[in-house]
Amino acid sequence: MMASNVTNKTDPRSMNSRVFIGNLNTLVVKKTDVEAIFSKYGKIVGCSVHKGFAFVQFSNERTARTAVAGEDGRMIAGQVLDINLAAEPKANRSKTGVKRSAADMYGSSFDLEYDFPRDYYDSYSATRVPAPPPLARAVVPSKRQRVSGNASRRGKSGFNSKSGQRGGSSKSSRLKGDDLQAIKKELSQIKQRVDSLLENLERIERDQSKQDTKLDDDQSSVSLKKEETGVKLIEETGDSAEEGDLLDDDEQGEDTLEEIKDGDKETEEGEDEGDSANEEDS
């Protein structure tokens, strides 16, 4: 069961049993985490978490003091807690101390949390703590004046921020225009380079095609020349063969003529011999 959010009761009994937790990383630590940490000391009547600090309302003062003694200086979520009783702020600490009071650390939001007359709080804290009351009175008005001053500054800064935003938007639009012009220029340069590369490639292709056609023509001419030389060789060999045959035929004819002549001579000689023999017989 979750505790109540009410931690601003003005009766002294509630004040003595209320614990202030300062330097709290409220971005990480939630109300349930605070209740889980402090519930081990006793019953929690109320718990409220604000930006940077929190309050825990216990049922009695003894439990609250035990919780302060047990958790003061503990590190949670990367920050060292500054814990004290809400009725006993640490205004009496030395100026060189590490920890500060809640009013110094958190400004007017801490003071507004109590929601009771400032004179009563000052008198009560003066009776409980030996710290001089004028310090507490001097701190609070200065903080409140700073808040009002901050509000006026916020108004001025808001106007200035609007004008600054307008100026920034005009500068950004101008920068965007310059960037666009630069990009456009680079793109045009890239396009020119690509076009020149394409022209070079086309020229190379044309030259290569011309070389290929020339090689084809040379090869075809070489093949034609080879064919012509082959035909010539064949014709020459045929002519030489025919000439050889003719020569052979001529030689054979001459041989036959000589044989015929020799045969005629032999027949003539035989006739002469026969005639001479006949003459002798007669």
Swiss-Prot record:
Keyword terms: Coiled coil, Nucleus, Ribonucleoprotein, RNA-binding
PROSITE patterns xrefs: RRM
Motif (Nuclear localization signal): 141-147
Molecular function terms from GO: N6-methyladenosine-containing RNA reader activity; RNA binding
Residue ranges that the Swiss-Prot or TrEMBL entry lists as coiled coil: 177-217
InterPro entries: hnRNP_C, Nucleotide-bd_a/b_plait_sf, RBD_domain_sf, RGS_sf, RRM_dom, RRM_HNRPC/RALY_subfam
Residue span of region Disordered: 131-177, 208-282
Ranges of compositional bias, category Acidic residues: 236-257, 265-282
First-listed, main subcellular location of the protein, grouped into a coarse class: nucleus
A Pfam family annotated for this UniProt entry: RRM_1
Protein name: Heterogeneous nuclear ribonucleoprotein C
Compositional bias ranges of the Basic and acidic residues kind: 208-217, 224-235
Stretches with biased composition (Low complexity): 161-172
Domain RRM stretches: 17-88
Function field: Binds pre-mRNA and nucleates the assembly of 40S hnRNP particles. Interacts with poly-U tracts in the 3'-UTR or 5'-UTR of mRNA and modulates the stability and the level of translation of bound mRNA molecules. Single HNRNPC tetramers bind 230-240 nucleotides. Trimers of HNRNPC tetramers bind 700 nucleotides. May play a role in the early steps of spliceosome assembly and pre-mRNA splicing.
Assembly, per entry: Tetramer.
Gene Ontology CC: nucleus; ribonucleoprotein complex
Family named by the database record: Belongs to the RRM HNRPC family. RALY subfamily.
Localization terms from the record: Nucleus
GO biological-process terms attached to the record: mRNA splicing, via spliceosome
